[in-house]
Amino acid sequence: MPAYAIYFLAALAEITGCFAFWSWLRLGKSALWLIPGMASLALFAWLLTMVDAAAAGRTYAAYGGVYIVASLSWLWLAEGVRPDHWDMTGAAVALAGSAIILAGPR
């Protein structure tokens, strides 16, 4: 599976897992939300190990840009808050950084 697909799935798993904790602690949802939340966070960690990279830190750094874009998508689609110009500019810069890390000759 290509790295970008793994990063997309990892971001979805991480944001879903973190939102489960947010829902429990900030929105007053049942503690049962933590069960799928923890499973989702475990899936996130496992997915990042599937990226073909020699160093974990480089994998995490490249993933960071994808996570930012996925988080802003979640903000808009799940929470109904439209990202502003500054959100989108920051996401573009982060994605450019991720692309440099991923595509750099090694």
Curated annotation (Swiss-Prot):
InterPro entries, per database record: UPF0060
Q: Where in the cell is it found?
A: Cell inner membrane
Record keywords, A-Z? Cell inner membrane, Cell membrane, Membrane, Transmembrane, Transmembrane helix
What GO CC annotations are associated with the protein? plasma membrane
Check the record and name the Pfam families matching this protein: UPF0060
TM region positions: 5-25, 31-51, 61-81, 85-105
Quick one: signal sequence residues? none
Q: Which membrane topology describes this protein?
A: Multi-pass membrane protein
Name the domain of life this protein comes from. Bacteria
Secreted among keywords: no
Query: Which family does the entry's similarity section mention?
Result: Belongs to the UPF0060 family.
- Name of protein: UPF0060 membrane protein R01043
Q: Which organism encodes this protein?
A: Rhizobium meliloti (strain 1021) (Ensifer meliloti)
